[in-house]
Structure formats: structure tokens, C-alpha cells
Regions:
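Short conserved active-site loop signatures built around small residues
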Residues: 81
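Conserved "HGTGT" condensation-loop signature of ketosynthase/thiolase-family condensing enzymes
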Residues: 1-75, 90-94, 105-137
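Short acidic donor-binding loop at the edge of a beta-strand
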Residues: 98-99
């Protein structure tokens, strides 16, 4: 088994960015991570990521430049980025590739995530207690 190390990190600032999509913010974060690692996008051999708001987060590799790398879509609510990082690390650990990148990206409107938390398996009392609200700016 191969050792795994995080060699670069990128983060888009938190906040409200009118006119900028979640995918565009994800691209900025991924480019920052690649630069932080001292690499080029063409050095990345695989990616994993997910999003609540973007139905096709794998399309982000096309925004960065199609290089033919595999992209694993994950969805695990607020733990999606952590699940993507684990999927990426597992691929490296198992020897599938040497350099991977993980991304989690979302852009929520102000207020409740959905009108009905039951749509995502949450009980109604979750919303009734005010526990289903996005951060307000």
C-alpha cells in the first residue's frame, strides 16, 4: 500500500458571490490547490467530488481542461468533501494513481435548504426546531 499525503490545499472564500456558480468557485479552489502543490492541472491523474447544488460535479474537469482523468461523484450531505478526500486517498493508497484531487462545492440561497426536509430524509421536527437553515449574510 502507498502512503498518502495532502500536498496542496485550495479554498474559495466563504460568502455570497452573485453571478458566480458553485462550479466556478470549485474551479478556483481546485486551481489554488494544484498551484499550492507546485503542480499543473495536467499532473492530476484522478478526481473525486460532489455537490448538493450542482447535479453534475464531474463536469468541473471539463472547465479545467479535459485530460481524460476519471472523476468519482460522491454525495454525503455536509460530509461530501470528506468522503471525496477519502475516495481520492483510497485510490492513491491502492496504487490506482499517484496524484489525485478532491473537491466539495455548493452555493445555497439564503434561508432554508428546501421547503420540505423530508425530501432528503430529515424528520419534520428538524426544520421545526430551526435546524435546517443556511447561514445568513
Amino acid at each position: 500500500m502507498n502512503d498518502v499525503a495532502i500536498i496542496g490545499v485550495g479554498l474559495h472564500p466563504f460568502g455570497r458571490f452573485e453571478g458566480k456558480t458553485a462550479m466556478a468557485m470549485g474551479v478556483e479552489a481546485m486551481l489554488a490547490a494544484v498551484a499550492d502543490a507546485g503542480l499543473r492541472w495536467s499532473d492530476v491523474q484522478a478526481a473525486a467530488g460532489g455537490s448538493w447544488t450542482a447535479a453534475n460535479p464531474d463536469a468541473i474537469v471539463g472547465m479545467l481542461g479535459l485530460t481524460g482523468i476519471p472523476f468519482t461523484n460522491v454525495f454525503n450531505a455536509c460530509a461530501t468533501a470528506a468522503s471525496a478526500a477519502k475516495a481520492c486517498a483510497d485510490g492513491i493508497r491502492l496504487g490506482d494513481y499517484d496524484i489525485g484531487i478532491a473537491v466539495g462545492l455548493d452555493k445555497h440561497p439564503k434561508g432554508a435548504f428546501t421547503e420540505d426536509p423530508a425530501l432528503v430524509g430529515m424528520p419534520r421536527w428538524y426544520a421545526e426546531n430551526g435546524q435546517y437553515l443556511a447561514t445568513q449574510f
